[in-house]
């Protein structure tokens, strides 16, 4: 992430994992936060701000459930977690996306903003 957004270098860690299916991937994101929070607060924030770019679900989903999804990613609220390390909180969020259609639609949305 720091290579794309240098101002975030060292602040967040994330990876995108292409799962062994023809059309589906996930983002595994870990962020250190300054303000202590809860899993419920995090999920409430994602749910409240859900839109065509970033959706939110609490349904138990798997990679095949997001095939043909046009959103940038779908946050899986069931997998949100908080890890406490030396008095600091690491927020763990997982989001699924269609690495074909979802990616294409996200590129179109990005181009519209340029």
Question: Where in this protein do the model-derived segments appear?
Answer:
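Glycine-rich phosphate/pyrophosphate-binding beta-alpha loops
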Residues: 18-19, 96-103
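Internal hydrophobic alpha-helix adjacent to the cofactor/substrate pocket in enzyme cavities
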Residues: 105-114
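C-terminal substrate-binding/catalytic lobe of Rossmann-fold NAD(P)-dependent oxidoreductases
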Residues: 1-91
């Amino acid at each position: 992430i720091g290579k794309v957004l240098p101002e975030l270098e060292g602040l967040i860690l994330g990876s995108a994992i292409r799962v062994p299916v023809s059309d589906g991937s996930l983002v595994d994101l870990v962020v250190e936060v300054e303000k202590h929070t809860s899993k419920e607060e995090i999920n409430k924030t994602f749910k409240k701000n859900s839109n065509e770019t970033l959706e939110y679900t609490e349904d138990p989903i798997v990679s095949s459930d997001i095939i043909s999804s046009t959103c940038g990613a779908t946050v899986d609220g069931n997998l949100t977690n908080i890890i406490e390390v030396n008095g600091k909180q690491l927020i763990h969020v997982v989001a699924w996306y269609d690495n074909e259609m979802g990616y294409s639609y996200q590129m179109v949305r990005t181009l519209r903003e340029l």
